[in-house]
Structure formats: structure tokens, C-alpha cells
């Protein structure tokens, strides 16, 4: 198996993983939170988490710009500065997307987990 085939397998596995994650996210989000207090708390946790991420990524964006420029200028000797900078920026964007989707999934699941446990009479809310 050559490198190109391995690359295609990696891409296919990544896309499959995204599909599974999307399916599970939608399955969890299909659970309705019936308790008004739990729904309100879940909403506030979500709002706080998103505010934190926006503040963090706003700060991080300056770091990303500085490192990207350092990669661009530092790689002029071997001619790989531009390519390395682009790879770094793509990685940073993917990291931000993973952070947002992970935080959104986690905060969304909190209240729904409590609701599902209550539906099974495991807890009283």
C-alpha cells in the first residue's frame, strides 16, 4: 500500500468519523428537556461556555498570526515557509472548529442527560 492509498484511507476514516459524530449529536439533541429549570440552567451553561470560547479564541488569534508570520519568514531559506504557514493555519482552524463543536455538544448534552435519567426514573428533577 503506497502513501496515496493510505492518505485516502485516512480521509475516508475522518469523514466516517464526522458522520458518526453528526449522527450522535443529532440523536442526543432530539431529547427534549421537559423541566423548565433544567432547560434554563442548560442554556446558561451553554451561553457561558460560548462566551469563554469566544474570549479565548479572540486572544488566541493574535498568537496564531504571530506564529504564522514566524513560520512564513523562518521558512524562506528552504522554500517551505508558505506551505508550513498554510498547514499551521488550517490546523488552527480545525482546532477551533473542534473546540466549538465539542463544547456545544458537551453543554447541550448536560441537561439532556439529566432528562434521560429522569425519564428512566434514575433521578428526580
Label every model-predicted segment.
Residues 45, 123-125:
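Conserved small/polar residues in nucleotide/adenosyl-binding loops
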Residues 2-98, 102-106:
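N-terminal alpha-helical transmembrane segments of multi-pass membrane transport
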Residues 33-36, 115-122:
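Juxtamembrane helix-boundary/capping and inter-helix hinge elements in multi-pass membrane proteins
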Residues 108-112, 116:
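Hydrophobic transmembrane alpha-helix segments characteristic of membrane transport
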Amino acid at each position: 500500500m503506497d502513501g496515496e492509498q493510505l492518505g485516502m484511507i485516512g480521509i475516508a476514516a475522518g469523514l466516517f468519523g464526522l458522520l458518526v459524530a453528526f449522527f450522535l449529536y443529532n440523536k442526543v439533541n432530539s431529547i427534549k428537556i421537559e423541566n423548565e429549570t433544567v432547560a434554563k440552567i442548560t442554556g446558561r451553561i451553554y451561553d457561558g461556555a460560548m462566551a469563554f470560547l469566544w474570549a479565548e479564541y479572540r486572544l488566541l488569534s493574535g498568537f496564531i498570526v504571530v506564529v504564522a508570520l514566524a513560520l512564513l519568514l523562518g521558512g524562506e531559506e528552504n522554500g517551505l515557509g508558505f506551505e508550513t504557514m498554510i498547514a499551521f493555519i488550517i490546523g488552527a482552524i480545525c482546532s477551533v472548529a473542534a473546540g466549538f463543536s465539542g463544547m456545544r455538544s458537551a453543554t447541550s448534552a448536560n441537561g439532556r442527560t439529566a432528562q434521560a435519567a429522569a425519564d428512566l426514573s434514575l433521578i428526580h428533577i
